[in-house]
């Protein structure tokens, strides 16, 4: 009842994510919800830099890599200016992982990562649209023999 009231008052909004086994519904504050919280002297926290969808899939990817024996660092700084969503390390292997919702500049992200030296690069697309966008970006950036190829995974591979 409370959730429905908050939804109808546009204080929160639902974010529906497809998973291998169905879907997950997450909720986040709207701008109106942030204003309402502040009006009642409740700190809504900082405005997230990333979408709720992106943050959720980064956590899922972290759990997936940890289950496979990797030590995982979130928002790992890379050469130049920026960070990758995940750095997964285990003896003899270092992997950079980018979670892509299809809403960012995938080609720029990919080009930036390719300049860094890692054993493997993985992009995780979170939807069919993101798969398409990632495939196009990978084709545009191309493969360089001295750099590792990009492996494209989907939400079905980690959910």
Task: Indicate residue ranges for each PLM-predicted region.
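Short beta-alpha junction loops
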Residues: 19, 33, 124-131
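Domain-level recognition of nuclease-like catalytic cores that cleave nucleotide substrates
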Residues: 128-159
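Interdomain/boundary linker segments immediately adjacent to catalytic/signaling cores
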Residues: 1-57
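Structural motif
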Residues: 75-78, 98-102, 124-128
């Amino acid at each position: 009842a409370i959730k429905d009231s908050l939804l109808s008052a546009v204080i929160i909004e639902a974010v529906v994510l497809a998973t291998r086994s169905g879907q997950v519904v997450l909720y986040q504050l709207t701008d109106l919800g942030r204003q309402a919280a502040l009006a009642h002297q409740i700190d809504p926290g900082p405005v997230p830099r990333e979408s709720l969808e992106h943050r959720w899939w980064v956590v899922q990817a972290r759990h997936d890599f940890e289950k496979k024996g990797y030590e995982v660092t979130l928002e790992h700084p890379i050469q130049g200016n920026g960070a990758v969503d995940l750095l997964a390390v285990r003896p003899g292997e270092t992997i950079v992982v980018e979670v892509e919702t299809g809403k960012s500049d995938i080609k720029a992200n990919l080009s930036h990562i390719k300049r860094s030296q890692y054993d493997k690069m993985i992009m995780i697309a979170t939807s069919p649209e993101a798969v398409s966008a990632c495939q196009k970006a990978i084709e545009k950036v191309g493969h360089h023999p001295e750099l590792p190829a990009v492996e494209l995974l989907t939400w079905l591979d980690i959910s």
